[in-house]
């Protein structure tokens, strides 16, 4: 089953496969599935304590890993969270969080469905 290109950019995954074969792209996707929730929790926890430095670090990590797999909406919003955090805009970060959570959930769901389909093949 092909991934939804509005959620995961197939060109990003193709680049990973070009650089390191299917094993690399599968490993990068696995790492996103494994570590992404921790990064999202880091941003949420940071906002609970109004810790913008922690929010910035979590958003930066999430942005980078999302870029690797082509989760462009996650990357874009995480970038906005990172910038707002670095500028001390706590309210803006709080406003962005629901959008980031939604985009992240869609990306995770898409990767999980793809992993299930790949395992069945």
Feature annotation, model-predicted:
Residues 1-121:
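Two-component system phosphorelay core
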């Amino acid at each position: 089953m092909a991934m939804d290109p509005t959620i995961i950019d197939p060109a990003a995954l193709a680049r990973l496969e070009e650089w390191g074969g299917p094993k690399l792209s599968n490993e990068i996707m696995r790492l996103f599935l494994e570590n992404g929730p921790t990064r999202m929790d880091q941003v949420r926890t940071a906002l609970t304590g109004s810790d913008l430095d922690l929010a910035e670090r979590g958003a930066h990590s999430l942005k980078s890993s999302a870029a690797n797999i082509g989760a462009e909406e996650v990357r874009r919003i995480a970038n906005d969270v990172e910038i707002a955090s670095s500028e001390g805009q706590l309210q803006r970060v709080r406003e962005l969080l629901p959008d980031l959570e939604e985009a992240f959930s869609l990306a995770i769901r898409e990767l999980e469905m793809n992993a299930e389909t790949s395992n069945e093949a």
